[in-house]
């Protein structure tokens, strides 16, 4: 891996923050992202407790990946990407970001997008975790969002300034597994920001140009 991965991730997310200034959080908009499978029926409190436990587990795993000793920055990023790849509903997120554009793509274009998307999106989330790893997670509230999802609102202390607010949108799949379909830090949802950005980019430059850009940024 070339360059300094985490610095490049921070530069990318800095531009996202500027783009997202006027974008409401996903927890408030609650878009209906397509789900590959139906959610299990569960008692509301049981589903909420499971979602809280999953958010805590994912945070702990991310902390281990990003703070391990004796590993390079690139190795830490790779370990963190593995945590996210296992915890995120990448298919749901990837489809949501493409929106209706996916319907016009060829099988080859979809295959390339699906191949490069995991590396691309986990790099963007990596910077959001940089400010919360190793800090205690405090659950403020959790609530059901529709029939399938739970929003877990948490905060992490910051050395200077107020706490960092993080909303975790968790979905329980039919097979019983828990998956994150969005992580919203300080009110900014990469899922929503990138959906708008992808749509505008494709309209101006075409699908192939977007795929080339994602490949380049995933390997940066």
Predicted regions, residues:
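Bacterial N-terminal signal peptides
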Residues: 14-21
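Solvent-exposed loop/turn segments at secondary-structure junctions
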Residues: 102, 119-120, 144-145, 158-159, ...
